[in-house]
Amino acid sequence: MCASITAGKPVTLERVQSVADGLLPVRPGDLTFAHVTEFVDDVITVTDEEIIQAVKWLMITAKLVVEPSGAATAAAVLFASGGARLAHQGMTVAVLSGGNITHELLVSLFAETDRSSCE
């Protein structure tokens, strides 16, 4: 989506890869792009590592199991450098969605990085 916003029109990417597989269209739909153009003021991007940290933080701290795509909003608020912009704008709401995460993926996310890094 960021490439499309920058270009001012929907852009087709050659390849996309992320732990957040639900956020990986190679091209945003025309209607989605139109809505983003009209209603979105700012975009904060997050890394896969920040998303993984958010998945782990949500599970350990909030006792919520959220798939990586659904944890991207929490990653922006909790860990992304752009999240600091949110602190100056008053109340922030992060919608969490999706429990579509397998036990195997959840275990692998915890195995990839040290658990203490999200506490």
Where does each model-flagged region fall?
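Glycine-rich phosphate/pyrophosphate-binding loop at beta-loop-alpha junctions
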Residues: 1-39, 83-119
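Active-site-adjacent helical/loop segments in soluble small-molecule enzymes
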Residues: 29-89
